[in-house]
Amino acid sequence: MDAILNYRSEDTEDYYTLLGCDELSSVEQILAEFKVRALECHPDKHPENPKAVETFQKLQKAKEILTNEESRARYDHWRRSQMSMPFQQWEALNDSVKTSMHWVVRGKKDLMLEESDKTHTTKMENEECNEQRERKKEELASTAEKTEQKEPKPLEKSVSPQNSDSSGFADVNGWHLRFRWSKDAPSELLRKFRNYEI
């Protein structure tokens, strides 16, 4: 209880400050900052400094907590709640105890930039897809108009009206003449389809 009452936040407890990162930093940024700091204060480079080992261990612990999604979420919750106890002690508490503590938690920092690169590239890809769809619709409309112009007019019945049995037969045979495949050069749309460009 005395530890909680006499608790003072130390800079070593703030893992983001220790690594020189921000709470919005990605895992890659955290790892890059860790490597830089670890090279600066590695115990092998400073054997005469007794605090080098302690500092390096703190850096490793900060890296382990901040690169793991679950532990980072717990750390961020603890940090924003401004609990007056060390993070290790907070971690040791049972989940039921944590939920019974009704502390107001500050919200996460807002992003300085509105969109990330991924969001921007996704929007650009969607716009390109929409443009391609519009082009395809226009091509389909133009090819449909061309086929309507080329399509022969329906054949008149070549069978005399006297022979009623053969008129049905003539319609069946004439069907393929009305809806036959065009022997013209394939359209641009058909070429793209065959080459898997669509």
UniProtKB/Swiss-Prot annotation:
UniProt keyword Transmembrane helix, yes or no: no
Induction comment from the UniProt entry of this chain: Up-regulated by ER stress.
Keywords for the protein's UniProt record, in alphabetical order: Acetylation, Chaperone, Cytoplasm, Disease variant, Phosphoprotein
SMART domains listed in its UniProt record: DnaJ
GO CC terms: cytoplasm
Pfam families the record matches: DnaJ (PF00226)
Modified sites of kind N-acetylmethionine: 1
Positions of the UniProt region annotated as Disordered: 114-169
Domain J: 14-79
Top-rank taxon: Eukaryota
Disease with which this protein is associated in UniProt: Hyperphenylalaninemia, mild, non-BH4-deficient: An autosomal recessive disorder characterized by increased serum phenylalanine, normal BH4 metabolism, and highly variable neurologic defects, including movement abnormalities and intellectual disability.
General function of this protein: Probable co-chaperone that participates in the proper folding of biopterin-dependent aromatic amino acid hydroxylases, which include phenylalanine-4-hydroxylase (PAH), tyrosine 3-monooxygenase (TH) and peripheral and neuronal tryptophan hydroxylases (TPH1 and TPH2).
Protein name listed in UniProt: DnaJ homolog subfamily C member 12
Organism for this UniProt entry: Homo sapiens (Human)
Organism ancestry: Eukaryota, Metazoa, Chordata, Craniata, Vertebrata
